[in-house]
Amino acid sequence: MAAKIKKNDQVIVLIGKDKGKIGIVRKVIAKSKVIVEGVNIVKKHTKPSPSQNKKGGIVEQESSINISNIAILNPTTKKSDRIGFRVKNGKKVRFFKSNNTICN
């Protein structure tokens, strides 16, 4: 099955502590998890590494979120939407189901 959500898609969070936040997908992990820019920020404790000249401390970074907890944002309606597939000129393209516009 083709990926309905891809890198650089604008998405909205549906469930969780960041519900309602909008961000851009930075990475898709194994078709079940994604990393969204500015969403699900966690604090990671790192040890100092003198060989790599890295200081230790607490670093904030984005953690993965399940793909079922996000939805793609339709730029024309500014609301969450579902994605469908169709063949156009011999190529498989994604489209928004609410208004049948082609997704980039």
From Swiss-Prot:
Where is the secretion signal located?
none
GO MF terms listed in the record are: rRNA binding; structural constituent of ribosome
What is one term from the GO cellular component aspect held by the record? ribosome
The lineage's top-level taxon is Bacteria
User: What is one process in the GO biological process aspect for this record?
Assistant: translation
Question: Per its UniProt record, what InterPro entries does this chain match?
Answer: Rib_uL2_dom2, Ribosomal_uL24, Ribosomal_uL24_CS, Ribosomal_uL24_KOW, Translation_prot_SH3-like_sf
Q: Which Gene3D superfamilies match?
A: 2.30.30.30
Q: Which residues form a coiled coil?
A: none
Q: Which UniProt keywords apply?
A: Ribonucleoprotein, Ribosomal protein, RNA-binding, rRNA-binding
On assembly, the entry states:
Part of the 50S ribosomal subunit.
Q: What's this protein's function?
A: One of two assembly initiator proteins, it binds directly to the 5'-end of the 23S rRNA, where it nucleates assembly of the 50S subunit. One of the proteins that surrounds the polypeptide exit tunnel on the outside of the subunit.
**Family statement:** Belongs to the universal ribosomal protein uL24 family.
Give the protein's recorded name.
Large ribosomal subunit protein uL24
Organism (species): Buchnera aphidicola subsp. Baizongia pistaciae (strain Bp)
Q: Which gene encodes it?
A: rplX
